[in-house]
Amino acid sequence: MSKVCVLTGKRPKYGNTVSHANNHRRTRFEPNLHTKRIWIEEEKRWAKVKLSAKAMRIIAKTGTGELAKLLK
């Protein structure tokens, strides 16, 4: 299963974890994804999507219209 947000396109990033002794170790930083069931009013149906926390705030502010365009 992919770890990509449907709305924002956020995906895992790679970088270094740095210890107090300044040792660098490669790591993968995962996006804050949640699987949600969202009601799309325009199509009168439920959609199960993976959304980041930022995407959930966007939907709360603007509604599901933008999400409906992406799911087509």
Curated annotation (Swiss-Prot):
Source domain of life: Bacteria
GO biological process: translation
The keyword Ribonucleoprotein belongs to this UniProt entry's keyword annotation: yes
Alphabetized GO MF terms: structural constituent of ribosome
Keyword annotations of the record: Ribonucleoprotein, Ribosomal protein
Any single Gene Ontology cellular-component annotation: ribosome
InterPro entries: Bacterial_rp_bL28, Ribosomal_bL28, Ribosomal_bL28/bL31-like_sf, Ribosomal_bL28_bact-type, Ribosomal_bL28_sf
Gene3D superfamilies referenced in this protein's UniProt entry, alphabetically: Ribosomal protein L28/L24
Transmembrane segments: none
Family of this protein: Belongs to the bacterial ribosomal protein bL28 family.
Stated name of the protein: Large ribosomal subunit protein bL28
Record organism: Chlorobium phaeovibrioides (strain DSM 265 / 1930) (Prosthecochloris vibrioformis (strain DSM 265))
